[in-house]
């Protein structure tokens, strides 16, 4: 595997309580929202103080900016499955993709080219063989920082990665597929992820909720917690049937879940297809 070295000064040592090879337990995928030149410039700028371990351009070239043994500055404030501050425990991969800030004239997100995805799969296979990165810990930036980040986006082909043995993608339950319109093309059904429209703004139910809504909401929060999302503070510990749940605050977390697991159904709500999918994924992650 050919790798182009383009060192960044933005890194720090990993925790020293274990050999660094054992500390690496997460793989975090991002998009740059910039072209290659601007991406490399920013990720190597001392003033910006951000970085990642690898950048993959649209033609599939792989650049290494930070050595695996060091912690790159890519995750920021983050949480996944009980672990906070994932810079210390992760490898960060940035894909050159213009993302949500650069939609085409039809409002479509730019697809991930097949050459880029092929290189990503090769790199992920290499990293998973080298370090104890389990399938449950292959995540997107939006999974670990849902209130701040939306990359790699709903157009990222998680299915394609899962078919290559990287991460997980269980088939959609029939009810969720029918309700969400997922029976059509899924992102990742081909070598290159297809274009997909940008997500709408979240619409969340007003509180207080009805007893039935509150029960579904509480079940959804518990499912997201079981999967690994940070739902701390969103469940106020009260009686769910009394509507003591913060629907507005958790909408970004629901959207992050939908971007990952229900990418053609983005509304920030625990509606029936979302709740069904969340409970299915939670069972897989338990």
Annotate the PLM regions.
Residues 117-132, 148-286:
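Cell-envelope/ECM-targeting effectors and their regulatory/trafficking segments
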Residues 133-148:
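Acidic/histidine-rich, metal-coordinating catalytic segments
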Residues 1-136:
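Active-site-adjacent loop/helix surface patches within enzyme catalytic domains
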Residues 100-102, 146-150:
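Short, well-ordered, mixed-charge alpha-helical segments that flank or form enzyme active sites
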């Amino acid at each position: 595997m050919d790798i182009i070295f383009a060192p960044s000064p933005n890194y720090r040592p990993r925790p020293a309580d274990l050999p660094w090879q054992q500390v690496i337990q997460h793989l975090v995928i991002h998009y740059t929202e910039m072209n290659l030149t601007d991406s490399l410039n920013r990720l190597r700028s001392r003033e910006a103080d951000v970085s990642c371990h690898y950048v993959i351009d649209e033609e599939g070239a792989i650049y290494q900016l930070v050595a695996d043994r060091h912690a790159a500055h890519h995750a920021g404030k983050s949480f996944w499955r009980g672990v906070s501050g994932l810079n210390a425990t992760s490898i960060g991969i940035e894909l050159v993709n213009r993302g949500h800030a650069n939609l085409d004239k039809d409002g479509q997100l730019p697809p991930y080219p097949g050459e880029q995805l092929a290189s990503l799969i090769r790199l992920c296979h290499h990293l998973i063989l080298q370090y104890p990165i389990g399938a449950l810990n292959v995540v997107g930036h939006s999974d670990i920082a849902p209130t701040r980040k939306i990359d790699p986006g709903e157009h990222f082909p998680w299915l394609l990665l899962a078919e290559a043995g990287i991460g997980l993608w269980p088939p959609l339950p029939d009810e969720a597929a029918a309700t969400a319109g997922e029976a059509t093309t899924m992102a990742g059904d081909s070598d290159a992820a297809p274009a997909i429209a940008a997500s709408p703004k979240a619409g969340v139910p007003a509180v207080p909720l009805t007893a039935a809504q509150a029960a579904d909401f509480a079940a959804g929060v518990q499912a997201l917690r079981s999967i690994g999302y940070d739902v701390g503070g969103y469940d106020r510990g009260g009686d769910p049937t009394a509507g003591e749940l913060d629907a507005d605050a958790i909408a970004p977390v629901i959207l992050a879940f939908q971007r990952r697991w229900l990418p053609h159904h983005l509304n920030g709500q625990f509606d029936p297809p979302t709740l069904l999918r969340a409970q299915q994924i939670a069972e897989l992650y338990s």
